[in-house]
Amino acid sequence: MSPCENDTPINWKRNLIVAWLGCFLTGAAFSLVMPFLPLYVEQLGVTGHSALNMWSGIVFSITFLFSAIASPFWGGLADRKGRKLMLLRSALGMGIVMVLMGLAQNIWQFLILRALLGLLGGFVPNANALIATQVPRNKSGWALGTLSTGGVSGALLGPMAGGLLADSYGLRPVFFITASVLILCFFVTLFCIREKFQPVSKKEMLHMREVVTSLKNPKLVLSLFVTTLIIQVATGSIAPILTLYVRELAGNVSNVAFISGMIASVPGVAALLSAPRLGKLGDRIGPEKILITALIFSVLLLIPMSYVQTPLQLGILRFLLGAADGALLPAVQTLLVYNSSNQIAGRIFSYNQSFRDIGNVTGPLMGAAISANYGFRAVFLVTAGVVLFNAVYSWNSLRRRRIPQISN
């Protein structure tokens, strides 16, 4: 038994704080290496502009692809063995892989390790499942919104810290530093997360068909998975062209990279501020209302982004967009909590993670293809159309299905 465990009832608020710290550490660890990923690919022997772009895209995307494949398996194991065990597995596994990445000698080794990183991931969806099964239902929106800010905070801090560390110590040492962050996450989880879980034998586990039939609204849950996918497609579609769009708007300035970094970061800052507050509001008025309103608000912000004339205008709109984005995934997760039981929470959240990962892969591809054929500004208009479809689709799905009453 760990020092933080005893026979007293589980304090879900303490677990939320520790899970938030774990999501922060894993978010930071994942994003620490992002600023110099193409540079590391080049250091491993890839030369030429086209080859470097291709390999950088592949090693970036393959992690999400393999995460999408592995998530349902880990979700099922979490429902059998417990969510804390999956948190420990994820943190330790990713830490070991990060060490090996720092030792990679060629691009193929690095590619395999990036795929392995995706296979062994899953800290955040399991943290979501753990908190969702412990928190009172009438506080789910606030709790999951608060938890989401952990990963966002880490993702905001990671690139800045990673760039600074790479400049100071070189590229390979950053992987070892990242591994130490993940090992720290492992020990924090080991000693301070409490879970009372009764293991379930494989024979007693619900099969896929039984999972579907046990859901209160199977079609609604599937529509929420699709909503998650589209949210990530919309978010990712802008990523490949943002720096180039900022350069086009800024003209001849020497600090384009700094301006781009600021504009890339402001949505995360806004999401940090909005997610807990809108989650709490969702607990009062219903997460479905928050979801639809945030989607419509996003459409109204994406359209003018196509017509901005200065980086400042783009930055202001992206800040407001971040405030809306901060409500989207927590609202979806809260609706998933309302429409599933604790017995299958691990699998439901892992399926949702798979759809999210697919969106992470397809979004940048969509944005790059649109910008190559129709220009940067068209990306924002097409993305607005995708989000508008998502709003109509979600509204129709939620309208046709009565949201279960929130109970304590």
UniProtKB/Swiss-Prot annotation:
Name the domain of life: Bacteria
The answer on whether this UniProt entry bears the keyword Disulfide bond reads no
Instruction: Please give, as recorded in its UniProt entry, the membrane topology of this protein.
Output: Multi-pass membrane protein
- Please provide one cellular component term from the Gene Ontology annotations of this protein: plasma membrane
* Family that this chain belongs to: Belongs to the major facilitator superfamily. DHA1 family. MdtG (TC 2.A.1.2.20) subfamily.
Q: Which Gene3D superfamilies match?
A: MFS general substrate transporter like domains
What HAMAP family does the annotation carry? MFS_MdtG (MF_01528)
What are this entry's molecular-function GO terms? transmembrane transporter activity
- Report the Pfam families cross-referenced here: MFS_1
| Alphabetic keyword roster | Antibiotic resistance, Cell inner membrane, Cell membrane, Membrane, Transmembrane, Transmembrane helix, Transport
Q: Where in the cell is it found?
A: Cell inner membrane
Q: Which GO terms describe its biological process?
A: response to antibiotic
Q: Where are the transmembrane segments?
A: 16-36, 58-78, 92-112, 115-135, 146-166, 173-193, 224-244, 256-276, 290-310, 319-339, 378-398
| Role noted for this protein | Confers resistance to fosfomycin and deoxycholate.
UniProt KW Transport keyword = yes
Record organism: Escherichia coli O1:K1 / APEC
Q: What is this protein called?
A: Multidrug resistance protein MdtG
